[in-house]
């Protein structure tokens, strides 16, 4: 066959038929890589998860769900969820483009969550804590009656067990579909936190992107120490609403964690990879010193009591020896 005939036959041949991808193959392909919304760089998803869902190129903190937050903060096999049975109802029979009841059902199916917060207790670097993690995927992390009840019960449990409380905040505010029932959660959670504080117990909220509305106006700003992630949007009313009300241009960094740190509304901005270690250090510093006393029949000349500080505390030595008098 001549070269001319070969090219002629090739042109007549039908192009190969591309087989469409199955939904499973397409899902795997879509999940292999994640595009940074800030710089646009594609990163292998497993590498991104290994870096706490922080872009390796620009340092942008990608939004993470509540399950990932728990995995990042709580020691393996120590997480014990509580009050998982609580589910929202539709007392107002609210309906916009779809009924609130249908919206709840669809969101529960999409996220595999009962509502916008997970609560429980576990160990953070060996330290027992009570933890609440809000999930923005569930109706924008909005605070309804179930979110308020779960957080309130978590704080009451922590008060009873004398545990520090950490709440990861990510919310658009109160849930309008529940009306006054959602707004009253602000006062209810604040009251539970006051009882917790009166017992000299530690509460640390961590403000992530975004933390706005009724959450900001209540428990997000009531911490003994308030931490925030870099470049998180934190505020009450929206930027456009404030500009239209005041009729003036706001600073470019307005309602960011850096702006709030500069004006004294948050105590520290902590990058996500350092969050667990920072929380462990702060909780350890708040823990009391526990004296280890010798047995009653021990030789007092050979045994020295020690004051033990948790291994994660900011101390030069992990154990501080105290010499006995005489």
From Swiss-Prot:
Main location, first listed in the record: cytoplasm
Annotated zinc fingers (C4-type), start-end: 36-58
Residues holding Zn(2+): 36, 39, 55, 58
Zinc-finger listed as a keyword: yes
Catalytic reactions of this protein: N(6)-carboxybiotinyl-L-lysyl-[protein] + acetyl-CoA = N(6)-biotinyl-L-lysyl-[protein] + malonyl-CoA
Record GO biological process: fatty acid biosynthetic process; malonyl-CoA biosynthetic process
Single annotated GO MF: ATP binding
Keyword ATP-binding: yes
Domain CoA carboxyltransferase N-terminal intervals: 32-301
Xref: InterPro entries: AcCoA_carboxyl_beta (IPR034733), Acetyl_CoA_COase_Trfase_b_su (IPR000438), ClpP/crotonase-like_dom_sf (IPR029045), COA_CT_N (IPR011762), Znf-ACC (IPR041010)
EC number: 2.1.3.15
Pfam family, one: Zn_ribbon_ACC
Subcellular location: Cytoplasm
Cofactor notes: Binds 1 zinc ion per subunit.
Any one annotated GO CC term: acetyl-CoA carboxylase complex
NCBIfam families assigned to the protein according to its UniProt record, in alphabetical order: accD
Subunit annotation: Acetyl-CoA carboxylase is a heterohexamer composed of biotin carboxyl carrier protein (AccB), biotin carboxylase (AccC) and two subunits each of ACCase subunit alpha (AccA) and ACCase subunit beta (AccD).
Protein name as catalogued: Acetyl-coenzyme A carboxylase carboxyl transferase subunit beta
Organism: Synechocystis sp. (strain ATCC 27184 / PCC 6803 / Kazusa)
Top-level taxonomy: Bacteria, Bacillati, Cyanobacteriota, Cyanophyceae, Synechococcales
